[in-house]
């Protein structure tokens, strides 16, 4: 993985005078790409790259240039293609030759050959930009599921783009201004974001499954959707569906093991990470190599953990079961409060926004521990969104309730906001508008029963909102340590197929992700295969709640704290007084009282560190 950035415009003088800005933008990408840096400045274009070398370490340098049939193409690219051999063969048949075996070179030739039509041919996770020197156009594209980020804005009669928000903010033409709508995104929806919203004024994010063309002579930006979830007839019976799922999942995992650097897997002892680890283990064992697996836990969690309906049991027994089952070398990573609290702020630096509190911070530290052992890791994200694993898919009360199922607390959130901070924005209407817009974008084939229509809506809501929040988290926290994390369940072929699968198949035998479990029968030990879903682990140690409470009291006692300009101090006092007993989660299943307190710490830090101008 890497980081990309750039600016293209009508007037070459604008580009030539911004070299210092490009150096600053490149520096913001140093953690994403610690291995090599490159910059292309010519005429009206500047393309910037910071590389994390994973494939073809010698020949994959960027920006990469190709002269083909009278045009000069320059590429900067962040991601991995998982069908590189097929693309290379198709291009070779059309007369293309290659200097190395990198997917970067294949992607560049693919664009030169097929133009925008190359994007649907790609299976992978990517965000890339191609400058066509003679045509004076910039092409931007993002993968179907939104695994890799790409932000942009129009300023100085030009287009400025980058992998992260901080990259754009390093440019003098992009001030850290946040208007009422942007602030409402943070306070009412965060850590989620409206698809395409960059929070900062005039900053947008290219949507998953979208590409854009910017014409420098007219300053015109045109957006195109090349992929979306579409509902189709599903003729397969359950047995055929299970076979297809097994083939798709196995192929997706095996394709994502390609690397010229060490590869590891996350292992929680849950269904998704265990499946990935088993298939990866077989792959490496067949090659005479040993897989490395990593698990995260917290000091004294065995002492303080108590089961809930969301977290029915601890991970450790199942991790040990998998350790015995695999041929891998396993690493236990144990986190503690003194490490977690400072990481709350590093997590904001990584995400450029308040995030998921210690759910972010713990992942950041976990990835930091993995990096000395591996450059690439595979993780089980997105299986729950696609196979229907979350409680809100299965609990009819929650499923049929109006609104985002992971964020039923708009009134509670609004109770913290000082009057007038959001201008004339009505919190309930703001959230409702986005919910209704997503429902309206849901593909439902004619004649589908109402219950199945609702399940299509649920998958679309989760795919466009909740999954994007988790993918943001995974990308920013891992890349902050220069670790590339791949997510096999985000293979678009799996999402396409599963979207139209009847709910009775997905919920086979009334078990969450029953279809996936049945499809992979015999691959895992039964205790792991049929284990109830348990989410990403968090600390239960009361020392963490005490530590973040102390930090928030320090903020409350600071009259200059930016948090207090927008948040009611009395509401924060009430939150602190509730201890661990507040039943209202801030977001999802995991962000209860300790995480909500930590989120306000992140909000205060973000306002100060990023010098946010509220306009």
What are these regions (language model features)?
Residues 387-412:
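A mobile, often basic/glycine-rich helix-loop segment
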Residues 1-345, 350, 363, 521-522, ...:
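Cysteine-centered catalytic environments shared across enzyme families
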Residues 308-311, 347-349, 391-398, 615:
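Short secondary-structure boundary/capping segments
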Residues 374-384, 388-390:
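Short acidic/histidine-rich active-site segments
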Residues 1-4, 23-27, 42, 72, ...:
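Adenosyl-5′-phosphate
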Residues 243-265, 369-373, 377, 470, ...:
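Phosphate/ATP-binding catalytic cores across multiple sugar-kinase/actin-like superfamilies
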Residues 103-104, 123-125, 180, 274, ...:
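Conserved glycosyltransferase catalytic-site signature
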């Amino acid at each position: 993985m890497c980081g990309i950035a750039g600016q293209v415009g009508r007037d070459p003088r604008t580009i030539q005078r911004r070299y210092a800005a490009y150096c600053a933008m490149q520096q913001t990408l140093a953690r994403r790409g610690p291995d090599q840096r490159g910059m292309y400045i010519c005429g009206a274009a500047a393309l910037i790259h910071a590389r994390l070398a994973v494939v073809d370490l010698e020949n994959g340098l960027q920006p990469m240039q190709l002269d083909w049939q009278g045009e000069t193409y320059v590429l900067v690219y962040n991601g991995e293609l998982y069908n590189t051999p097929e693309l290379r063969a198709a291009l070779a048949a059309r007369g293309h030759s290659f200097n190395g075996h990198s997917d970067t070179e294949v992607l560049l030739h693919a664009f030169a050959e097929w133009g925008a039509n190359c994007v649907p041919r790609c299976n992978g996770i990517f965000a890339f930009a191609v400058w066509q020197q003679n045509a004076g156009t910039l092409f931007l594209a993002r993968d179907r599921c939104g695994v890799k980020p790409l932000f942009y804005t129009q300023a100085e009669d030009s287009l400025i783009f980058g992998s992260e928000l901080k990259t754009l903010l390093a440019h003098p033409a992009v001030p850290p201004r946040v208007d009422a709508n942007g602030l409402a995104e943070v306070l009412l929806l965060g850590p989620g974001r409206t698809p395409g919203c960059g929070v900062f004024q005039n900053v947008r994010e290219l949507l998953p499954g979208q590409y854009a063309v910017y014409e420098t002579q007219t300053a015109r930006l045109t957006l195109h959707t090349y992929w979306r979830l579409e509902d189709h007839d599903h003729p397969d019976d359950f047995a055929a569906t299970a076979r297809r799922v097994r083939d798709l999942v196995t192929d997706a995992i095996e394709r994502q093991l390609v690397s010229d650097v060490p590869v590891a897997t996350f292992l929680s002892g849950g269904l998704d990470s265990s499946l990935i680890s088993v298939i990866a283990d077989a792959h490496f064992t067949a090659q005479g190599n040993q897989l490395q697996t990593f698990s995260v836990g917290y000091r004294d969690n065995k002492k303080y953990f108590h089961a809930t309906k969301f977290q029915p049991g601890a991970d450790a027994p199942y991790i040990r079961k998998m350790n015995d089952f695999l041929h891998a070398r396993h690493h236990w990573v144990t986190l503690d409060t003194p490490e977690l609290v400072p990481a709350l702020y590093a997590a904001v630096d990584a995400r450029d926004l308040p995030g998921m509190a210690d759910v972010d911070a713990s992942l950041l530290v976990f990835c930091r521990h993995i990096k000395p052992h591996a450059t690439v890791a595979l993780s089980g994200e997105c299986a729950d969104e696609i196979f229907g694993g979350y409680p809100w898919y299965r609990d009819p009360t929650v499923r049929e309730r109006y609104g985002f199922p992971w964020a039923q607390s708009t009134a509670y959130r609004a109770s913290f906001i000082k009057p007038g901070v959001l201008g004339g924005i009505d919190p309930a209407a703001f959230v409702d508008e986005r919910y209704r817009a997503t429902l309206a974008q849901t593909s439902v084939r004619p004649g589908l029963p109402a219950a199945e229509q609702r399940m299509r809506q649920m998958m679309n809501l989760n795919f466009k909102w909740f999954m994007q929040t988790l993918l943001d988290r995974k990308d920013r926290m891992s890349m902050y340590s220069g670790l590339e994390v791949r997510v096999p369940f985000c293979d678009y072929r799996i999402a396409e197929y599963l979207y139209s699968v009847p709910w009775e198949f997905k919920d086979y035998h009334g078990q969450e992700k029953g279809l996936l479990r049945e499809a992979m029968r015999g691959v895992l030990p039964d205790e792991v295969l049929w284990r109830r879903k348990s989410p990403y682990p968090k600390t239960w140690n009361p020392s963490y709640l005490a530590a973040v409470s102390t930090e928030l009291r320090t903020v409350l006692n600071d009259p200059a704290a930016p948090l207090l300009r927008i948040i009611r101090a009395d509401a924060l006092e009430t939150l602190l007084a509730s201890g661990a007993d507040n039943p209202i989660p801030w977001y999802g299943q995991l962000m209860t009282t300790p995480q909500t307190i930590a989120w306000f710490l992140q909000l205060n830090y973000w306002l100060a560190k990023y010098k946010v101008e509220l306009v």
